[in-house]
Amino acid sequence: LSEEEFHVDGVNGTYPNCMYDGTSLLEGGQTAAGSILTWFKNNLLPAAWMQEAVNRNMNIYDLITEKASEVPIGCDGLVMMDYFQGNRAPYADSKARGMFWGLSIGTTPAHLARAVYEGVAYGANHCIVSMKKAGYDVKEIYACGGLAQSDFWMQMHADIIGVPMYTTVESQSAGCLGDCIIAAVGVGIYPNFWEAADSMIRVDKEYIPNMEAHK
């Protein structure tokens, strides 16, 4: 949301008074994020990892995170482009395709896993950078959905983008909560969306960017 109207190439909007009077909405996003990690699990996951998860009675995504966290920041030069279903923002190109770049004999499955995490986070940052170039100052980000369940991924987003990230108690049902906020204002429980949101949205976790990692 912004109090000013301006245009960002590849990002939808601004939509004046879309949510609150006197504010405008910008809409940019990725066509694939958590689904790329699911793709990795379904297609590239080593059988030994699956067996290890069974032996340790561990969620497979937690094990993937553990393996990825053992790889250095920057993934030893391996880069993953997140255009697995095209690019929504800032290029708006449905024909763009994802890739791994920088593979070597030393590349391991853990490198590929970390590259997925980093690539998705950098994809989000690409949208933010485009907005900043147009004059929009992003000060904090609230995340919801499946990706927001991962502390590792949320901290990585904060480190790469360079602003605090927050998740909410209702992050897995954010759409339903939004409906409740609208209804609460509609029936007069709250006088406006600002007060309703302040009262009904509860922050769960905060991720402060590590500026050393950001470099």
Which residues are covered by each model-predicted region?
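Glycine/Thr-rich phosphate-binding loops that ligate phosphate moieties of nucleotide
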Residues: 2-215
